[in-house]
């Protein structure tokens, strides 16, 4: 019986092939994480020339800071809205395009367009449309007696950044959902239709369970996206306002580290955010993946 394990002529070749990825991981992930952990235990001057070990004082100060607690819950709320809304909307459009016979190529291309737009550009686009004075959407809302001004209304500001973030990510989610739906054997759908199952029942009883692995993958990806990659959207759309209503943890880290020059507090917040993402990811793999059936 032959073994399928690859055999290399040189014992060093496998390590050589893995080395580039290991170097990138060390330089861009492990090293910065170690630096953040070290600075989080220090009291650092604004220019980083001198430091003094203070232990966990920076973390204690964080959790006694009401603004930090507010940004923590804002992050949880924002990430939940972006992740859940993004997945549901993308799945809806993927299922819709799946059942469109004529012109499906046009709709596929249309759904992929947001992916080509930079996050900051996406934010500026929706700022123009939601501009309180000249925006097309705000003019339409005013016709129905609804006053829109996201610069003064915290709820409207949160809606704007969530909406822009979901719109930016919808193409990525759509692509995976649509490919997953296309991979479902037609015989299963046709057999269910012969048995009298309608389109909605076929989707929830056959299609949705079969695309569960893709859904779980996108759940993890969208959670990371909501925590980190939405920074340009928030920065361009609201700058964390009004009154820090849209200041997420990642934006607060930037503001304290690069604007306030409080390197120690910024590092401590980075460590807390890192552990928060790790805990949420482990929980997803522990409790959500256990319900996913892989083929």
Swiss-Prot record:
One of its GO terms (biological process) is transmembrane transport. Residues 33-80, 131-156, 229-262 are periplasmic. Gene3D superfamilies: MetI-like. Keywords: Cell inner membrane, Cell membrane, Membrane, Transmembrane, Transmembrane helix, Transport. GO terms for cellular component: plasma membrane. The keyword Cell inner membrane applies. It is a multi-pass membrane protein. This is sn-glycerol-3-phosphate transport system permease protein UgpA. The complex is composed of two ATP-binding proteins (UgpC), two transmembrane proteins (UgpA and UgpE) and a solute-binding protein (UgpB). The gene is ugpA. Residues 1-11, 102-109, 178-207, 284-295 are cytoplasmic. The chain crosses the membrane at residues 12-32, 81-101, 110-130, 157-177, 208-228, 263-283. SUPFAM superfamilies: MetI-like. Pfam families: BPD_transp_1 (PF00528). CDD domains: TM_PBP2.
């Amino acid at each position: 019986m032959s073994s399928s394990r690859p055999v290399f002529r040189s014992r060093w070749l496998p390590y050589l092939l893995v080395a580039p990825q290991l170097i990138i991981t060390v330089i861009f992930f492990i090293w910065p994480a170690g630096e953040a952990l070290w600075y989080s235990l220090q009291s650092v001057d604004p220019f980083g020339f001198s430091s003094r070990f203070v232990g966990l004082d920076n973390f204690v100060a964080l959790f006694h800071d009401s603004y930090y607690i507010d940004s923590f819950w804002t992050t949880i709320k924002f990430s939940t809205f972006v992740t859940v809304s993004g997945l549901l909307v993308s799945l809806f459009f993927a299922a819709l395009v799946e059942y469109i016979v004529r012109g499906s190529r046009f709709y596929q291309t249309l759904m992929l367009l947001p992916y080509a737009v930079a996050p900051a550009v996406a934010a500026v686009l929706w700022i123009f449309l939601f501009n309180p004075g000249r925006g097309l959407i705000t003019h339409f809302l005013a016709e129905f007696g609804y006053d829109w001004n996201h610069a003064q209304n915290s709820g409207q500001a949160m809606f704007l950044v969530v909406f822009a973030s979901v719109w930016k990510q919808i193409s990525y989610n759509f692509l995976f959902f649509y490919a997953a739906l296309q991979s479902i054997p037609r015989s299963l759908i046709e057999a269910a239709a012969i048995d009298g199952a309608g389109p909605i029942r076929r989707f929830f009883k056959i299609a949705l369970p079969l695309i569960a692995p893709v859904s779980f993958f996108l759940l993890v990806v969208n959670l990371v996206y909501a925590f980190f990659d939405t920074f340009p959207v928030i920065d361009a759309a609201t700058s964390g306002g009004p009154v820090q209503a849209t200041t997420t943890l990642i934006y607060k880290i930037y503001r304290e580290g690069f604007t306030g020059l409080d390197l120690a507090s910024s590092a401590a917040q980075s460590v807390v955010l890192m552990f928060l993402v790790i805990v949420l990811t482990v929980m997803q793999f522990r409790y959500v993946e256990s319900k996913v059936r892989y083929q």
